[in-house]
């Protein structure tokens, strides 16, 4: 099976997102890469399911709170940008201040 570099990146993000999801479910506080991966993975999957850009932006802001991440992580993540594939094409989704 041949994967393009973009497909490899998507697969790596998905794997990191699953790991972050499991750690969050265990009650562990997420670090920077885990928080980014969780938000990114959810946006990519939602886009693939046919949701709108606005829905994905809202989802990105609702996924994590300060209690879900390690100290200082919320301040480190000001924006998350994801290039996601929607039914009508690839679009850039930007989530400002995703951790409340």
UniProtKB/Swiss-Prot annotation:
It holds the Pfam family Urease_gamma. GO terms for cellular component: cytoplasm. InterPro entries: Urease_gamma, Urease_gamma/gamma-beta_su, Urease_gamma_sf, Urease_subunit. Pathway: Nitrogen metabolism; urea degradation; CO(2) and NH(3) from urea (urease route): step 1/1. Coiled coil: none annotated. It comes from the Bacteria. It is found in: Cytoplasm. One of its GO terms (molecular function) is nickel cation binding. Heterotrimer of UreA (gamma), UreB (beta) and UreC (alpha) subunits. Three heterotrimers associate to form the active enzyme. Belongs to the urease gamma subunit family. This is Urease subunit gamma. It comes from Pseudoalteromonas translucida (strain TAC 125). The gene is ureA.
């Amino acid at each position: 099976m041949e994967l393009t570099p973009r497909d490899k990146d998507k697969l790596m993000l998905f794997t990191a997102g699953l790991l972050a999801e499991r750690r969050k479910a265990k009650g562990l506080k997420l670090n920077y890469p885990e928080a980014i991966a969780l938000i990114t993975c959810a946006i990519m999957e939602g886009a693939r399911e046919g949701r709108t850009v606005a829905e994905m932006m809202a989802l990105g802001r609702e996924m994590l709170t300060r209690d879900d991440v390690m100290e200082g992580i919320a301040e480190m993540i000001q924006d998350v940008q994801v290039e996601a594939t929607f039914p009508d094409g690839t679009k850039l989704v930007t989530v400002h201040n995703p951790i409340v």
